[in-house]
Amino acid sequence: MSIIIRVEDLRAVYLVREGTIKAADGISLDILENSVTAIVGESASGKSTIIEAMTKTLPPNGRILSGRVLYKGKDLLTMREEELRKIRWKEIALVPQAAQQSLNPTMKVIEHFKDTVEAHGVRWSHSELIEKASEKLRMVRLNPEAVLNSYPLQLSGGMKQRVLIALALLLDPVVLILDEPTSALDVLTQAHIIQLLKELKKMLKITLIFVTHDIAVAAELADKVAVIYGGNLVEYNSTFQIFKNPLHPYTRGLINSIMAVNADMSKVKPIPGDPPSLLNPPSGCRFHPRCEYAMEICKKEKPKWIRLDGEAHVACHLYEEGRPLK
Amino acid sequence: MNYFVNRLLYLLVVFVIAISGVFVLVNNMPGDPAYGLAVYIAQQRNMQFEQALEIAHKMMGIDPHESVVTRYVKFMNNLLRGNFGYSTFYNTSVNEIIARALPWTLFVISLATFISFSIGIYLGAFAAQKRGKTIDTLISTLASIIQAIPPFILAVLILFVFSVRFRLLPLGGAYPVDMEPSLSISFIGKVLLHAVGPILAVAIPQMASWTLSMRGNTAQVMEEDFIRFAEMRGLADSVIASKYIRNNAMLPLVASLAIGIGYMLGGQTLVESIFNYPGIGFYFGKAIAVRDFGLLTGLFSLIVIGVIVATFVADFVYALIDPRVKLK
Amino acid sequence: MRKESLKNFYYDYIQPLLVNKKSLIGLIILTFFILMATVGPLIVPLDMTSNFAERYQKPSLKHPFGTDYFGVDIFQQIVHGSRSVISLTMLASFFAVLIGTVIGVARGYLEGIVGRAIDAIIMVFLVIPSFPALLILAAVFMNYNLNVVEIALLVAVWLWAPLAKQISAQVLSLKSKEFVEASKMLNMPLRYILFSDIAKLLIPYIFINFVMQIKGAMEFSVGLMFLGLAKFDPTHWGIMLNYALYQAGALYTAKGFHYIFFIILNIVLLIYGGILLSQGVEEVFNPRLRGNE
């Protein structure tokens, strides 16, 4: 499979009164075409920042400091605003996290489809628009007749999330990015959405990237998993390998914590300590204060992003020193 | 629909309580209902109090032997038939005065509202888009200074500057006393010129408050997630500014527009008095000054009706334009 | 202990107001007028005797604001009038907040028919156009020579309703909050719940509203005086304006401009001080209030 998006050393911060939040700190990542990639991390680990920086949709106080995001060989970050606007949504669509408030409360659903199409200079007649929108809505298992003429407040949380996905699929994008597609939904609806994304993956030739705090969701959907900790990418591997053989101590802790849910409670091993503050992140490896394998070097030096055999990437001194986790 | 029936009933109750309150206030003063008027007449005409009281009774159409309840029933009964009572000062029915005055007031407030609303919405949205910049600070500071000027004080200033000092505007009235009302261009021109002062005095403070509300609403809407999502979809800034930001920010204001017009019916008493502009407020002020309680209660009833109709219309308009309300 | 709580009060309520630009300027303006009202009359004598030789003198060192139709110094009148202007405004705001709070809290606590009746009363006062109603009330009571307190009450009657509505909504929402539930479960007396839990959360609310009433109270009282409906003090600025316009006819002569101008300037500046302070107070405290919702 070829690489469709290559992220190189991406750095982004948020400016707040207390200082700068170093939310994405030197992220490098290759996204494969027609694959499903999960970006997993705790809340406030900077996982959303990565996708927002990649698409240049950071909130007003966000700043991109450095890095390149190569899409089909062109850097999205240095592209002219006009050119980027054309690519956005038509080729790369982003479904934001706040699905519940992302539709204009005073506009019917159909109008959202209409203005999206108009913004991209696509010349569809009204009936064509209805037809296309209906097709996408059916794809996300919604009844087009009922939904298109509704106002957002008439839809349930899960329905709104699906409308956003349908809206994102409208112009047949090459890449679909979803920010926490299952958060703020009840368990049953979450399951529906996951099922739906699985179907989409089978049905369409599309590259999916999604962000989640729930590694179980990643296990179910993704081909590849990228694990974020404290604004750093710590591990990137195929889903199968990540679960079979987690390399980074943090990944191992994450996986242990979900295994415990449906297994013996006595084996629950939550990761001790608190997530790091991104205002003043720890020195060296940001995980070292919570890491049971921490060495002297971990406090001083930031581990390099290294490639091991196969698809495995990790940032951990244990591997630089050739002392892998057993 | 049920909601509207409920609302209407509720407003009717409010109306009855309000009107009854005023009736009781005016008619059931400690002692004699005509006491106040009698004191006034005695002072004005230099006569004995007893004599003045008798005149006052006649003027107010009060039979001292009739009970308050009987009078109240009479009054409400009349009101229900659209009879607003009798003015002792003008010696004519209140209905006739309303017919004479209401068009002038409606003329001034509708023009003033139209002007202030359109400019205020524009300025408020503009300031919010430029939040934190000098132009925003300028607009908001000016608007809050204007808010500190009560409309009647503004009226005094306008009258002094434009009418007395520079003689650009007439000193008062709705049209020149020496002109016969007609549909000629010169007459219409004079009418417009006479209305400029009152319109400015009403419109400028209104404009300031529309500007500030619109600025606040716009700033709030700009923070909403659906704005960011619209940007993500690649919509043009102009589309976002109008269909997403302005429409949502304006909704609550359109509803208050109707209520505002209702309140202005009686709220411009001082402005109309200062410009001698023969609208409802002018006659209301006159009724206060000469203690014409018949005229006072009649006009007040009209004002309350105006507010209630406006409140109802506002509810209706709001439900019509905002799906969030419509669907509840 | 007392000292500690005073200090906390300073850091919680006073210091933020001195940091915010709007509330600071507002406070400076209001303090200036309060000083004018308290100390001013002791320093500046008032001489109301007519002196037609000095009619409509322009502002000068001798007469900082010039003289009026009767040749009386305008500055002296403004200073002495500030006393009744400030006391009337403050009293009216105070009464409005008092009535609004009592009725609002009562409404929040009382359920059933009594609660709905209070609702209806609040609604009536919200809907009735207040200025015309105030004028009728004043006209009815005009011949009773009301004093400052009584006039302030007349004004306050038309100002309290919005506050009562807000407070009742606040109390209703607080009532359902867990900690009130908890004090009920712990079998603490209703009185305790009312004063301890709810009063604590309402204090900033009441404070903000007191400041916000200043504009309304000023406008209403000046309007009343301007119409000559309450004449307890000839140097009240509203009455001065009434004299200027209707007795002296200063409006219709270019010479009288300074007469009107200085009265208006003081009225507007005082209201503006109130508006600035309330905007500042709102900016400082409202996030905290929202946090309580």
UniProtKB/Swiss-Prot annotation, chain A:
Q: Which domain of life is it from?
A: Bacteria
Q: Where is the ABC transporter domain?
A: 5-255
What GO molecular-function term can you cite, just one?
A: 4 iron, 4 sulfur cluster binding
Q: What is this protein called?
A: Dipeptide transport ATP-binding protein DppD
**What keywords is this UniProt entry annotated with?**
4Fe-4S, ATP-binding, Cell membrane, Iron, Iron-sulfur, Membrane, Metal-binding, Nucleotide-binding, Peptide transport, Protein transport, Translocase, Transport
Gene3D superfamilies associated with the record? P-loop containing nucleotide triphosphate hydrolases
Q: Could you name the Gene Ontology cellular component terms for this entry? A: plasma membrane
InterPro entries, A to Z? AAA+_ATPase, ABC_transporter-like_ATP-bd, ABC_transporter-like_CS, Oligopep_ABC_C, P-loop_NTPase
Q: How does it sit in the membrane?
A: Peripheral membrane protein
Note how its activity is modulated: The C-terminal iron-sulfur cluster may stabilize the structure of the C-terminal loops and may function in the regulation of the transport process.
EC?
Answer: 7.4.2.9
Q: What's the record's remark on domains?
A: Contains an N-terminal conserved nucleotide-binding domain and a C-terminal domain bound with a [4Fe-4S] cluster. The C-terminal domain forms a stable loop region and interacts with the N-terminal domain.
List the source organism. Caldanaerobacter subterraneus subsp. tengcongensis (strain DSM 15242 / JCM 11007 / NBRC 100824 / MB4)
Residues annotated as binding ATP: 44-49, 61, 97
What are the recorded Gene Ontology BP terms? peptide transport; protein transport
Family the UniProt entry places it in: Belongs to the ABC transporter superfamily.
- Give the enzyme's main class according to its UniProt record, as a single word: translocase
Q: Where does [4Fe-4S] cluster bind?
A: 285, 291, 298, 316
Task: Please give the function described in this protein's UniProt entry.
Answer: Part of the ABC transporter Dpp involved in dipeptide transport. Responsible for energy coupling to the transport system.
The protein's annotated catalytic reaction(s) are:
a dipeptide(out) + ATP + H2O = a dipeptide(in) + ADP + phosphate + H(+)
Q: Where in the cell is it found?
A: Cell membrane
